[in-house]
């Protein structure tokens, strides 16, 4: 879109690789810090409930409410993750449709003589990033509130515990798989397995 040269592309690819390495390291620390913070929140929740009532809360697997909360908490991260991935796919398709429209309607764009409407593509990306994240954010925020007020602290404790374990495993899986896919794409684009423009390269894109 910027009509920059091949040398600029090589520089930005190198910077992107450095950024991916830095992000991969940072993600590990971020996941660990988030896990410790969530564990501290669960501990604070148990202590606060024990202070507010006479009988201390017991989060036992033999308790039906705790077990149901564990299943709900383990399910929510996968639901939020699926909604987020779907949002990314929808935004990508919207961007593709807009680019195709510009190729059809803007004279000389395909030949390189016309000027694309970059602002429209930016609006699609930012709009999708804001609108499509409303539902995942609402689920993450309101599900503990609804469960806690509707079914009691035992089920809420189970939800927090199940969500903690599920979130850690899902975050590690997504982080490693996403980094592996991105590096595999760059490996192909550097000339391996057919190089850029091959069928394998198109599949990676």
Regions inferred by a protein language model and the residue ranges of each:
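Long, amphipathic alpha-helical stalk/connector segments used for oligomerization, subunit docking
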Residues: 39-45, 49, 76-98, 103-112
């Amino acid at each position: 879109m910027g009509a920059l040269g091949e040398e600029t592309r090589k520089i930005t690819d190198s910077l992107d690789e450095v950024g991916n390495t830095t992000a991969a390291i940072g993600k590990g620390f971020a996941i660990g810090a988030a896990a410790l913070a969530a564990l501290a929140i669960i501990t604070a929740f148990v202590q606060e409930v024990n202070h507010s009532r006479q009988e201390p809360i017991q989060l036992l697997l033999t308790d039906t409410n705790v077990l149901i909360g564990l299943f709900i908490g383990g399910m929510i991260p996968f639901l939020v993750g699926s909604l987020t991935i779907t949002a990314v796919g929808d935004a990508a398709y919207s961007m593709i449709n807009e680019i195709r429209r510009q190729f059809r309607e803007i004279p000389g764009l395909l030949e390189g003589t016309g000027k694309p409407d970059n602002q429209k593509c930016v609006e699609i990306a930012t709009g999708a990033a804001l609108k499509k994240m409303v539902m995942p954010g609402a689920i993450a925020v309101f599900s503990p509130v609804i469960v806690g007020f509707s079914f009691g602290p035992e089920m809420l404790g189970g939800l927090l515990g199940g969500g903690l374990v599920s979130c850690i495993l899902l975050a590690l899986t997504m982080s490693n798989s996403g980094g592996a896919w991105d590096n595999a794409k760059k490996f192909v684009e550097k000339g391996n397995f057919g190089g850029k423009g091959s069928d394998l390269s198109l599949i990676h894109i």
